[in-house]
Amino acid sequence: MSDSEFLPQEGPKAFALVWRKVMLDPRGFYRDMPATGGFENPLIFLGVCGFVYFALRVVVFGLPDAINTIFLIALAYIFGPGILMLASQFVFQGEGDYEGTLRLCAYAGACLALAWIPALGILAYVYSLYLIFLGMEKVHRLDTTKAAMTTLVALVVTSLIIIWV
């Protein structure tokens, strides 16, 4: 079983192994994560995290809130990777591509499994930004400052898009 790539055919144990590695050893995870290999496995991983988030958010906050929140999260995952990639490449001369950017964002979605908890929700979102920052360093070969600036630029632009929707 690999802890650097989620393989759905290996079942729930594989999900738990990858989730644990992303959350507890993100530098090691992103170091070992292949920047290529397709969209399917990372998006399934993100989908499982999103389902856990949605189901538990329904229980805690009710269906209307859960639907609204999952819609906004989906928008962030639709626009966010593209904005990250464009900011990285055009502003900071990053070397990565869209596939690697989407993969790092999908695995940063591991935080969704904790974001439904009222007291921890905001911390989970902040930690997901940290995970994206770490992934940007590796996938786009950016130094720490450029990775941080890219993450902040993408956060601001994505937030503005979500606010306008």
Regions found by a protein language model. Give the residues of each.
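N-terminal juxtamembrane cytosolic/stromal segments of multi-pass membrane proteins
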Residues: M1-V52
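C-terminal ends of transmembrane helices
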Residues: G28, L86-F92, F133, E137-K138
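Membrane-helix interfacial "entry" motifs
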Residues: Y30-G38, P42, F61-D65, T69, ...
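Alpha-helical structural context
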Residues: M33, F90-V91, W116, V139
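Hydrophobic alpha-helical transmembrane segments in multi-pass membrane proteins
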Residues: P42-L84, R103-Y130, T150-V165
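Juxtamembrane interface at the ends
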Residues: F79-Y98
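Interfacial loop-to-transmembrane junctions
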Residues: G135-V156
